């Protein structure tokens, strides 16, 4: 488990990463609608603490199409497409849990699968058991890191290695599609992230 095997990084690396996140969050503050401002501000306010989380190798494009599962056993076989992987604070790609336990409709937004609550409870119980000794405050911080990861991925245009430099989303097809995820996970009371410990 990556939490127990953090990657060694220099103080300078952490500082550069934090400056990058701060700059990108500032861009989102200027570009995204007001309904997202409380979430952006919560990430800014927690950024110093987020940077104290274990630094781990994160798959930055962890989607259902990049996860290979054995059809008969439903066991994980492999994870592909590591081109955008980077060392970041733990939790920045946990928004993937939402995307794997629900589906996005262009008209209705995010809809959770019937077993969503059981899957999430199972994940957090297993994680807490494996890691051991996490306080409610640490779990809350991980959940805010998840929100930061969502904003950095869905608040911007594509971050793929072969694409132009990402910019905040706008009122185009990509922007509207990503806004559905931001609304679903940050605003909609039925599907928004739980950020409590």
Feature names for model-found ranges:
Residues 1-75, 188-196:
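An alpha-helical support segment within catalytic cores of ATP-dependent transferases
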Residues 49, 53, 63, 85-88, ...:
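Short, solvent-exposed segments of well-ordered alpha helices
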Residues 87, 96-197:
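Helix-rich C-terminal or lid/interface subdomains of diverse kinases
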Residues 65-94:
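Catalytic activation segment of kinase domains across protein kinase-like and atypical kinase folds
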Residues 34-37, 88-91, 117:
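Alpha-helix initiation and capping sites
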Residues 2-7, 80, 102, 131:
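Protein kinase-like catalytic domain
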Residues 57-59, 79-80, 149-156:
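Short beta-strand segments
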Residues 1, 20-23, 42, 57, ...:
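Alpha-helical elements of Rossmann-like donor-binding domains used by nucleotide-donor carbohydrate transfer enzymes
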